[in-house]
Amino acid sequence: MKKVNSLSGGKSSSYIAANYPADYNIFALVRTNDKSCEYPDKKIRQIVSDKIGMEFIATLEQDNIIKVMLDLEQFIGKEITWLSPKTFDEVINSNGTGKNGKQYLPNMMTRYCTTEMKIKPIFEWWQKEINEIVEMRIGFRSTEMKRAKTVMDKLNSKGIDEMKAVIGKSKNGNRNRWGMVEWRVPTFPLIPDNINNTDVFNYWQKN
């Protein structure tokens, strides 16, 4: 089973990239077209544009995440695949309302954007590049058992995460046929290895 490190730009997932070698390291970037948020370094904007294959104007995450991920790639000596097929603006403009045109509540929107801008791009990349069940490492620390349990509770009876996706065409070929696709087994290596926030902090202080 191939191993994928899912990177958020934070210290914990970066620790995983540095200490748990994988077949792939993946980072999904949340972009915006809002020029009032424009990333200040033109050279870095171009580097990121080249990595994602489209124009990068700004991120809605902390600006320092960009440099963290670029530096991490040099630190581990292995390519990090950047994903960002849609901007936040595009996602909200096309899907920002619920039934009857009502706006999503903030907690609903947060979950929705996590799926649309983090999980879904990684799934679509997986479909194109791998398309077989992978082990996906997530950077929850030893003190974050509750977060890990939330993820594990959503797995199917075989312990595999599923995503709703197009699996073919209808009999007449006019419509897409949807189904649940098994794609990843989430693992949390920092939990069994008892790595906590202090351990992660100290590691990056030394490195």
Annotate the PLM regions:
Residues M1-N207:
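Nucleotide-activated chemistry modules centered on ATP-dependent adenylation/adenylyltransferase
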